[in-house]
A protein has these predicted regions:
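Hydrophobic/aromatic-rich core segments of domains that either
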Residues: 153-219
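Conserved aromatic
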Residues: 9, 52, 98-100, 142
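Short, solvent-exposed alpha-helical surface patches in non-cytosolic proteins
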Residues: 49, 71, 112-113, 154
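Secondary-structure boundary elements
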Residues: 85-140
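Active-site nucleophilic cysteine motif
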Residues: 106, 110, 144-159
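Extracellular adhesion/carbohydrate-binding repeat motifs centered on closely spaced tryptophans
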Residues: 2-88, 126, 177-188, 192, ...
């Protein structure tokens, strides 16, 4: 009996060579194809907007696009976030830092720029809640002045659009040994798996100290932490918990 041997070779089929429409993941990068061709720029998919760079790669957790077309923040799933406070934060970052610099350098530049805003105690509020953070941040971005809670809230948005996890913390503080702790709020940013403080309002009052990205243990003043609110963004929507 004669056996006929057939030599069959398989060549790899890439996403752009198929007729499929949908998401494709290759080498840890995410793409979207329409009729087998990868897309770039903005794309509306299932009522949400996503941004693909010139290499067709989905961009995540960063500021994207251009000065001409406008800058936007996209969350960790790549969805464009349109909350007003996020838009203000993006504008602040683009105005006060350079895209050519490292993320940490940009955060530092933005921290210093925010510290130049006027400290203003024109409110009776001595506390902060999850529902008030967005309004506090919006006020600071619009009016360029605020108290400790407004500094903290706006910086939390700034840190997030730069790709950091961020939260707003409320408690008490004093720079004087025998004084009672005064109500206080500050921002914390997660870097190298550690939450670190960024305290704009106290930095304004104590220019000789470094209150940028310091641990609570290294913070030079007496401090009490009562509660923390972490920013969460999912599907383009911002919530605080």
């Amino acid at each position: 009996m004669a056996v006929l041997l057939l030599s069959i070779s398989y060549s790899p089929v890439f996403a752009e060579e198929t007729d499929d429409t949908g998401w494709v993941t290759e080498n840890s990068n995410t793409y979207y194809t329409v009729n087998g061709k990868r897309v770039k720029g903005w794309r509306k998919i299932d009522k949400k907007y996503y941004y693909f760079d010139t290499n067709y790669i989905l961009q995540k957790n960063k500021i994207v696009d251009s000065k001409k077309k406008g800058y936007y923040y996209v969350d960790r799933s790549g969805v464009r976030v349109t909350a007003p406070e996020i838009k203000y934060a993006v504008s602040f970052v683009m105005k006060n830092s350079s895209p050519k610099d490292s993320r940490s350098k940009r955060l530092r530049d933005c921290f210093e720029a925010l510290c130049k805003y006027q400290y203003y105690r024109g409110w009776l509020d001595n506390d902060i809640s999850a529902v008030s953070i967005s309004a506090y941040a919006k006020y600071m971005f619009q009016n360029h002045r605020g108290n400790c809670y407004r500094y903290a809230s706006s910086l939390a948005y700034i840190a997030r659009v730069l790709g950091y996890d961020s939260r707003v913390v409320a408690g008490g503080v004093t720079a004087y040994a025998y004084n009672n702790l005064s109500p206080h709020g500050w921002c914390e940013v997660k870097t190298e798996n550690t939450w670190k403080m960024c305290d704009c309002s106290m930095q304004n009052a104590h220019r000789d100290r470094n209150l940028f990205l310091v641990t609570r243990k290294a913070y030079p003043f007496r401090l009490r932490c009562d509660k923390a609110f972490t920013m969460n963004i999912k599907g383009g929507k911002v919530t605080w918990k």
